[in-house]
Amino acid sequence: NDVIEVNSFPLAKLREVNLDTRRIGLGVMGWADSLVRLGLSYDSEEALQLADRLGAFLNSTAWDESARIAEERGPFPQYENSALKEWGMPPVRNSSVITIAPTGTISRIAGCSSGIEPHFAMAWWSNVLWTDHEGTSSKLLDSPASVFQSLQEALGTEDEAKRILEKIIEDPDNAEAIMGDHGLDAAVYRTAMKISAEAHVKMQAIWQKHVTNSVSKTINLPNSASVQDVKDAYRLAWETGCKAVTVYRDGSKSMQVLETGASREDEETQEDHLKVPRQRPVSVMGVTDRVRTGHGTMFVNLTFD
């Protein structure tokens, strides 16, 4: 509530609208991790039921707290003209309370899965850039913490968990068979590309029931997906009440942030794709320009050698 008051806006009109509606966006992060730790597959009926219960709890708790704050500080200014009043909702401090954001970057910092997305893969290569006095680039082998911990507990040792992940990296298309050979429930570890478009949409729709804004969700489709497959995914999202949805066909970009598969480019090829910044000189010449913006004065420093 206090953050809304002190927020800085580039235009006075934006500040006015935000203070009149006082929209906030509580959300979810780490959903896929939770399912793995509970032993539930992302595309199972049990996972949908759990999402329904958690979404309802989050939504009702958020509105209850918003109503409590409204008793102390008053409802949002546009409450009297809002649909919330028409629907019989008591005075609340915020016109909207729930948003499930992408959280793609902050979830990696936090070490958990993003939003309500399934895991992208059990193990993958992250395209990273390391810089030092010479400049180097490489790919980093990674795995979701919940997956690694679950495998370690199931298999008994950290080395065994690593061995399984190495096998999956080499042969990702047979990941479920590899896990089955080691007595693991492959369905629990089913990843984004192995989950049907229908299951992706159903998960989003169940959360959307309890979200007052939008849900960030990607429907992952294989490279072989047709135009009709994409059309069907969007139609199902519309029919199930999703406010917005994104469809991504694997390999539709020349370079992806995350990759699966056994092939790794050698260092020479990587350097062709990843540009390494050259070393900055100790002293450079430069000029400073003062630029007027809608958010005040900005100083831009331009340096060159």
What residues fall within each predicted segment?
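Internal maturation/activation junctions in enzymes
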Residues: 1-19, 23, 40-103, 183-188, ...
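Catalytic alpha/beta core of large soluble enzyme barrels
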Residues: 1-6, 88-89, 98-257, 298-305
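Short capping/connector residues at structural and topological boundaries
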Residues: 19, 29, 45-47, 81-84, ...
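Contiguous, well-ordered alpha-helical segments that form the cores/surfaces of helical PPI scaffolds
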Residues: 22-37, 105-108
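A general alpha-helix detector
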Residues: 30-34, 50, 65, 146-150
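Short, Gly/Pro- and small/polar-rich lid/capping loops
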Residues: 259-303
